[in-house]
Amino acid sequence: MVEMNFKVDAFEGPLDLLLHLIGQLEVDIYDIPMAEITDQYMEFVHTMQEMELDVASEYLVMAATLLAIKSKMLLPKQELEIDYDTLEEEEDPRDALVEKLMEYKRFKEAAKELKEKEAERSFYFSKPPMDLAEYDDGTKVAELDVSLNDMLSAFNKMLRRKKLNKPLHTRITTQEISIDERMDSVLGKLHQQVNHRLRFDELFEEQTKEQLVVTFLALLELMKRKLVEVEQAESFADLYVQGKGEELS
């Protein structure tokens, strides 16, 4: 018999103790030698009682279970006339115990893995979120009545139309213009209208391709600043730019 050498409080329950005993004997968990395991388990329980320690009821229940399994396996098998047509494999008395042990072992291994991950995580330190209130100027991004895809589609359609109408011979002149200047230009055109409203393509008349791009970017910036909004009555209808704000008063 393997020498008993473990602390009484080293186990989390009877299944934990059984796994320890099986490990000491170095036997297959699916082929537990019940006589030897039961004897060692009972020795553990007796040791606890001799030390006047409270023996948890779960240990006593397991002791009774082990003794019952041991008794079943020691009973002589009756020699019966065998009908091989209806022969079924006799159930092993240890099956239920083995199933519980395997389930407990899986949980124990999972708990060990989680503990290792917790130890790894302890080496990382999270930085609390910064207060960015001082960087908030209160400006909110304008909610578009039309999507950016709608605007890009209208812009590309306008570029194709201008390309078709472009004369065969043109004189190219370089004229740099900033987005801020074009924003003022767009607001100026809207201000000239009674209702401060223009059709989208009316903002892009008589311009080079480069100027068209600058105008489009200026329009996006004006929308961001909530100085204008782009509207569309229904899907695939013309886009309209509506001025708003004190700049148009």
UniProtKB/Swiss-Prot annotation:
The keyword Cell division applies. Keywords: Cell cycle, Cell division, Chromosome partition, Cytoplasm. GO terms for biological process: cell division; chromosome segregation; DNA replication. InterPro entries: ScpA (IPR003768), ScpA-like_C (IPR023093). Pfam families: SMC_ScpA. Belongs to the ScpA family. This is Segregation and condensation protein A. The gene is scpA.
